[in-house]
Amino acid sequence: MNYDSATDLSRMIANKTLSCHELMQCTLDRIDSTNPEKNAIVAMADKDTLLQQAQMADNALAQGEYRGWMHGLPHAVKDLADIKGFVTSCGSPLLATNLPDQDSLFAARIREAGAIFIGKTNVPEVGLGSQSYNTLHGSTKNAFNTALCAGGSSGGAAVALAMDMLPVADGSDMMGSLRNPAAYNNVVGFRPGIGRVPRTGGDIFFGQLSTEGPMGRCVEDVINLLLTMAGADIRAPLSWREELGNLTDFKPVSLKNIHIGWLGDFDNYLATETGLLDTCEAKLKALGTVGSTISNCDLAFDMASLWQCWLTLRHWFLAHSADPLFKNPVTRAQLKPEVQWELAQAKHVTTESLGSACDVRANWYRTLVSAFEKYDFLALPSAQVFPFDVEQHWPTEIEGHGMDTYHRWMEVTIGGTLSGCPVISLPAGFDQNNRPMGIQFIGPIGEDKKLLEFALAYEQALPWQADYARIEHQS
């Protein structure tokens, strides 16, 4: 099927040049031919039922009922979120029969926009780690090379996008879970500013490390899905009241007026794989040729203290959400070692350490506010290593530097998370071994629209869609 984007598919359905039934059949055929190898989509719905739902969407359209831009689009939700009628396993055998009776808020909005839910996208066990493997569904393979990992925790979503199994995808992000798999599979991952996409489950006041967000093969699709997912909800007291407008309100910025601060590896603080910074810097240099100003940016911040801040807040957050599984010795023994370690560490969090972490986080935010007085956006790699062996759970060292935790190799993502600012991962290119990488851009708080308009301009100047042809030669 020839189309440029999910937004293009939407227009074709609205104009009746493509039927929902035809799209569903093509999608199911594509999944049949690619998913057995990649393992991106799990918990698939019955095919005949999906085709019937697609026909119902066509019938509704024939009667003048158009539900929204996702009318008839097949969609699979990340397997950490609830959709009615599908198991939310979170990649854990302990939750293999967890059948919710209602949609999560953002999924309800996607359903209301007309999407047809076809299944779930694969994740690491209980969403922890940036490698999408679990004992329930298995490992998701990289879109460009099945010997490599897909990243995570939205690994299934990113691979399904890159492999054209889904028109657009949702994900979530605490420690780069939208950004890392986007980078590893040459797609776009957008972590909205905190509160932009409301969350109504769990701690609605202090649970501000993770957020849902959109992924796409192009920026326009990411914007469209964000507009569906975003918007204030009375059940989410910290959700943004300001509306983002419509798709037509988003215009590419002039790159000649953009000043980017390159954070790189924070002056050799972060260990990075050889060639990774070069890949990102080459893309920034290309931005410079079209008029953007690129400058090295030294924030003069104690990054080691930010890591300790992160550990404390993450331990505390996860203990609150996963403690029931840890308290029961039977279920605790069935959790992967990394999850057991994370929850065990939470027992050592004190009121003093929590207060200190909050102070460091506040100072980090103030540091970025000062930086944004000079720069429009801050840039840094989306990961510290290129995609690695799918059989390896996580990198234990980077260029001779040992990683002391299972997630230390993703430290590059915590600054964006802790700031609460919007962050987008855009394709940065490939290394000499044809492994993809992405580059993160952090925007000021509340400036999600401005960051996405920059991303539109980036995509126009440095398009990446032709790179998907590499998949057929490497998979």
Placement of each model-derived feature along the sequence:
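Short, well-ordered beta-strand elements within core beta-sheets of diverse protein domains
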Residues: 8-15, 95-98, 210-217, 344-349, ...
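Conserved hydrophobic/aromatic pocket- or pore-lining residues that grip, position, or stack substrates
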Residues: 27, 50, 72, 78, ...
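Acyltransferase
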Residues: 17-25, 55-58, 272-299, 322-330, ...
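Short glycine/serine-rich loop/turn segments
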Residues: 70-212, 263-265, 382-401
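Short helix-loop capping/hinge segments that flank enzyme active sites or metal/cofactor-binding pockets
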Residues: 70-90, 252-263, 313-369, 381, ...
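Flexible, acidic loop-helix segments that line cofactor/substrate-binding pockets
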Residues: 39-45, 237-244, 258, 264-266, ...
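Structural helix-boundary/capping segments
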Residues: 33, 112, 162-264, 281-286, ...
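An N-terminal boundary/leader segment
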Residues: 1-52, 289-290, 467-475
